[in-house]
Amino acid sequence: MAQAAGVRRQLDSLTRNIFLRDVGRTVPEKSGAPLTGDSEVAPSVSLQIFLYFNAFYFPFWWVCYVIMLQLKYVLLPDYYKFILVVLLILMSVIEVIRLYLGYSGNLQEKVPELAGFCLLSILLQLPLLLFLLCDPGLEPLPLERAVHGILTAFLLIQIPISIFALRKATRHLAGRFHLLGDLDGRA
């Protein structure tokens, strides 16, 4: 019996080292106290800062995009007119959803929302912005290049930061799951 308890302690120590190496403790170690609903949430401050600035920059980008579209609308072929209007609507909807998912996923440490933010950023928003920046048929104006470039820079900075925040949140939740399983086994 004492040997089984020693093996259990060794396994417990090993799993704590593997799963909880860089995760803050959410319950007191070896206390046997019941786990309360309170948990430590550790959002990424750098991601939150860039989301904050992006939320304030997006209306400015939108107004500039609409003004530039109105200025060059008569010069564009019909298919580019259609593409640019659809892109404006699509990017506006995607950006609002993306910022909401980023805020809620980061602040509340919700992994699905943070993953959705990453996927929307990488798969939809970045290709659309690169199309607006790089297609010469759109006849981009200098102001357009500048505002699209700034939004692309925000996006290129947010993508790796959000991936690291997602990894951190996943590790944190895995550690909490491990602790819950460990506490249930002792009761």
Swiss-Prot record:
Principal localisation: membrane
The answer, when asked if Ubl conjugation is one of the entry's keywords, is no
Q: Which InterPro entries match?
A: Uncharacterised_TM-17
An example GO BP is:
cilium assembly
Q: Which residues form a coiled coil?
A: none
Is Membrane set as a keyword in this record? yes
Arranged from A to Z, the UniProt key words for this protein are: Cell membrane, Cell projection, Cilium, Cilium biogenesis/degradation, Membrane, Transmembrane, Transmembrane helix
Q: Which residues cross the membrane?
A: 49-69, 82-102, 114-134, 146-166
> Which protein are we looking at?
Transmembrane protein 17A
Q: Which GO terms describe its cellular component?
A: ciliary membrane; ciliary transition zone; MKS complex
- Per its database record, what is this protein's job? Transmembrane component of the tectonic-like complex, a complex localized at the transition zone of primary cilia and acting as a barrier that prevents diffusion of transmembrane proteins between the cilia and plasma membranes. Required for ciliogenesis and sonic hedgehog/SHH signaling.
Protein source organism: Xenopus tropicalis (Western clawed frog)
